[in-house]
UniProtKB/Swiss-Prot annotation:
HAMAP family listed in its UniProt record: UPF0161_YidD (MF_00386)
Protein name, as recorded: Putative membrane protein insertion efficiency factor
Pfam families for the chain: YidD (PF01809)
A single GO cellular-component term on record: plasma membrane
Role noted for this protein: Could be involved in insertion of integral membrane proteins into the membrane.
Listed SMART domains: Haemolytic
Keywords, alphabetical: Cell inner membrane, Cell membrane, Membrane
Length: 79
C-alpha cells in the first residue's frame, strides 16, 4: 500500500510525464520504438508499481529506446 508521501510523489511523476506528452512530445513527433510509448509506459508503471519501482522501470525502458534496439511490444510487468 502506498503511503501518502508515495502517492504524492507518484502524482508528481505522472504529472511531469503528462506535461511531456501534451506540450513537448508533439514538437518532435512520434519517435518511440515500443508499444506502449515510453511516456505511456511510465504512467502505467508508476500507477501500477508506485513511484520508486515504477520510476526505475521507466528509466530502464528509456535506456532501451534507441535505434540499435529492436522495436516491438514491451508491456509493464505485472506485480
Amino acid at each position: 500500500m502506498l503511503t501518502k508521501i508515495n502517492k504524492a510523489i507518484a502524482l508528481v511523476f505522472v504529472s511531469l510525464i503528462s506535461f511531456y506528452q501534451k506540450w513537448i512530445s508533439p514538437l518532435f513527433g512520434p519517435s518511440c520504438r515500443f508499444i506502449p510509448s515510453c511516456s505511456a509506459y511510465g504512467i502505467e508503471a508508476v500507477n501500477k508499481h508506485g513511484p520508486w519501482r515504477g520510476g526505475w522501470l521507466t528509466l530502464k525502458r528509456l535506456s532501451k529506446c534507441h535505434p540499435f534496439t529492436p522495436c516491438g511490444c514491451d508491456p509493464v510487468p505485472e506485480k
